Amino acid sequence: MNLLIMGLPGAGKGTQAEFIVKNYGVNHISTGDMFRAAMKNETEMGKLAKSFIDKGELVPDEVTNGIVKERLAQDDIKASGFLLDGYPRTIDQAHALDTMLEELGIKLDAVVNIVVNPDILVDRLSGRYICRNCGATYHKIFNPTKVEGVCDVCGSHDLYQRADDVPETVKNRLDVNIKESAPIIEHYTELGLVKNIEGEQEISQVTEDIKKVLG
């Protein structure tokens, strides 16, 4: 089985990716893992990627695409299939993936898209706060302090939010993700591959829904 998994930050993609890999025995391919392996093994594309990273420059699409193709050409993919996570990030990368899969003789079976209302994601992602005194982390919804405004660990009243976790910053980050992912989802929808999964349910129910669509 050859799959893509998509979903906005905070949608629970990582949890469901773990389930899919364990349940269906496919190879979990994340962008970060691919880059690290290619550079460690000094593949042609890995060396190219390292040259850009060492200069502090963004790795161009053709190099990223090349690293993905190197990984998809390996024997374990032919044997067990894959779950691609974190790629494609742009519509150009999606078209490049179509081409490389065709060249490798690999068929994409489904795109699992975990759908959550962005407003809910803002609450999920912007709820984190930290004790400045001891570093304990909390979440206003999922892991609140026992007494509001007081750290459970050290009793400090000095709790703060990182700039990255402020609602406005989170919303801006989600807006960028939505803009980039919308044409990719539209592309795979036209190909009849998208399986939309309601991600606002309990984690176990999201997992059950994925099992239903993948069989």
Curated annotation (Swiss-Prot):
The keyword ATP-binding applies. It catalyses: AMP + ATP = 2 ADP. It holds the Pfam family ADK. Pathway: Purine metabolism; AMP biosynthesis via salvage pathway; AMP from ADP: step 1/1. It comes from the Bacteria. GO terms for molecular function: adenylate kinase activity; ATP binding; zinc ion binding. Residues 127-165 are annotated as: LID. Zn(2+) binds at residues 131, 134, 151, 154. One of its GO terms (biological process) is AMP salvage. The keyword rRNA-binding does not apply. Keywords: ATP-binding, Cytoplasm, Kinase, Metal-binding, Nucleotide biosynthesis, Nucleotide-binding, Transferase, Zinc. AMP binds at residues 31, 36, 57-59, 86-89, 93, 162, 173. One of its GO terms (cellular component) is cytoplasm. Catalyzes the reversible transfer of the terminal phosphate group between ATP and AMP. Plays an important role in cellular energy homeostasis and in adenine nucleotide metabolism. Belongs to the adenylate kinase family. This is Adenylate kinase.
